[in-house]
């Protein structure tokens, strides 16, 4: 059992921000002044917040791209028919937010503002320019249209104005002035009984992270961002909500199942875990207080692994040494990964077996209960694995979700075996070779050579035009 202590250093780290910011709490929770334009250029705030700015800039050191599809080609099959089957990399530093959404194969290779596969909403977690545009055009104006429309406007990487009321006098004096810069996030927090302006400072610290590190979907004709929390934040609650409104992100091209794609539900999984339940915030673990060269405390904005700052993070509460805690976390991660792979194997078979049933003439009515099981199994699997830190945030909940996903996938396959038998198919359905990402993509009919060539042309021709236009309009520093 993990032992927890509340030592003097932990108390000191918690009390400093409390006493430091109590005097400005009322101003900090006030809404940004409507008459002041959101400033999206992060370097503008370096003079007032030099340590925070330089540590934020250091997220550019987190530059490695890890290809999740190459590590686990099963994902290609599970996301067949969806852009994630083309390209899915693990997350890296905030300094790459705009670059990565521009360069991923998922956003396509649009030639003009009305072209491309994805909506404007795909910019929503990438840049303080989003807050600027929402303030300028309203939410309807911002969300309207295709992703490419935002190219010349959304050019600054995730930064200051995403989490701080940078227009406030207190921010100019060096205070943090936290805010929810996305109105849809504020509405979601209110829906779960957490209005931002009434929340305590520690709650607010995690809520600003929860604007983006969260599950969401694109709602209505305008494809506006909405969090599916109306019925609650657990996986079953969100599943019920999506089913009730008959929402699907896409239809799997093999099984023809209307699917749900989880995003990055760190806020939900953190809330369900031991740290969230004890109000140990995102900031405590990922952005600890550290000292600069003069000995002044500041919040480290090089967001990263808590083990990289062990003395300022884990050691504030835990008595175990770093190696002991790393061993615990590694074991939890391995347990979750082992069950994850088992669920994926079941789902891969279910998608191909469903395709075989459809090819054999199965009707919509015959397929409906099977597709429901596939949909629910993959949703629960996805919500567990899309939160990359679930082995740390909520390992028990991760295993529980994966366990229910396994049950649902097994139910689907049992029903498929019976249905296939009625169609005269009693042999095992053959699965093509999907041992590599490339073979899996070929199995679902993707022309990756063409997709990559089109993307490279887009990167070479369209992105430079966007940046040139942004500089002319004063949106990027020269």
UniProtKB/Swiss-Prot annotation:
This is Cytochrome c-552. InterPro entries: Cyt_c552, Cyt_c_NO2Rdtase_formate-dep, Multihaem_cyt_sf. It comes from Escherichia coli O9:H4 (strain HS). Belongs to the cytochrome c-552 family. GO terms for cellular component: outer membrane-bounded periplasmic space. Ca(2+) binds at residues 215-216, 261, 263. It catalyses: 6 Fe(III)-[cytochrome c] + NH4(+) + 2 H2O = 6 Fe(II)-[cytochrome c] + nitrite + 8 H(+). Keywords: Calcium, Electron transport, Heme, Iron, Metal-binding, Oxidoreductase, Periplasm, Signal, Transport. It is an enzyme of class 1 (oxidoreductase).
């Amino acid at each position: 059992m993990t032992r927890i202590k509340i030592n003097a250093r932990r108390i000191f780290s918690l009390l400093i921000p409390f006493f430091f910011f109590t005097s400005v709490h009322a101003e900090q929770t006030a809404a940004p002044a409507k008459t002041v334009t959101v400033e999206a250029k992060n370097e503008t705030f370096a003079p007032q917040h030099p340590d925070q700015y330089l540590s934020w800039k250091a997220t550019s050191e987190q530059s490695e791209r890890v290809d999740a599809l190459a590590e686990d080609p099963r994902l290609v099959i599970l996301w067949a028919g969806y852009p994630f089957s083309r390209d899915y990399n693990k997350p890296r530093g905030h300094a790459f937010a705009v670059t990565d959404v521009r360069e991923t194969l998922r956003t396509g290779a649009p030639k003009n503002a009305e072209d491309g596969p994805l909506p404007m909403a795909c910019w929503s977690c990438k840049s303080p320019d989003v807050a600027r545009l929402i303030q300028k055009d309203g939410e309807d104006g911002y969300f309207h249209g295709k992703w490419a429309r935002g190219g010349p406007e959304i050019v600054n990487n995730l930064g200051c104005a995403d989490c701080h009321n940078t227009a406030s006098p207190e921010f100019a004096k060096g205070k943090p002035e936290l805010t929810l810069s996305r109105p849809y996030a504020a509405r979601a927090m209110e829906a779960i009984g957490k209005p931002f302006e009434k929340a305590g400072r520690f709650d607010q610290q995690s809520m600003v992270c929860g604007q983006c590190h969260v599950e969401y979907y694109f709602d209505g004709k305008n494809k506006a961002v909405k969090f599916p929390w109306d019925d609650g934040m657990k996986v079953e609650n969100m599943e019920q909500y999506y089913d009730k409104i008959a929402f699907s992100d896409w239809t799997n091209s093999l099984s023809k199942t209307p699917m749900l794609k989880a995003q990055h539900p760190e806020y939900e999984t953190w809330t369900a875990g031991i740290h969230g339940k004890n109000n140990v915030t995102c900031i405590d673990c990922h952005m600890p207080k550290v000292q600069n060269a003069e000995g002044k405390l500041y919040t480290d904005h090089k967001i990263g692994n808590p083990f990289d700052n062990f003395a300022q993070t884990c050691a504030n509460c835990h008595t175990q040494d770093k190696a002991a805690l790393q061993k615990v976390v590694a074991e939890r991660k391995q347990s979750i990964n082992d069950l994850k792979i088992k669920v994926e194997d079941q789902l891969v078979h279910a998608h191909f077996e469903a395709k075989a049933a459809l090819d054999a003439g199965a009707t919509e009515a015959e397929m409906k209960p099977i597709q429901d099981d596939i949909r629910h199994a993959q949703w629960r699997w996805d919500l567990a694995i899309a939160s990359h830190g679930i082995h740390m945030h909520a390992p028990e909940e991760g295993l529980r979700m994966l366990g229910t996903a396994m049950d649902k996938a097994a139910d689907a396959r049992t029903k498929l075996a019976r249905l296939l038998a009625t169609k005269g198919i009693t042999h095992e359905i053959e699965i093509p070779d999907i041992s590599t990402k490339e073979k899996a993509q070929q199995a679902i009919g993707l022309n990756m050579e063409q997709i990559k060539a089109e993307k490279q042309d887009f990167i070479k021709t369209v992105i430079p035009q966007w940046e040139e236009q942004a500089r002319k309009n004063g949106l990027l520093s020269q």
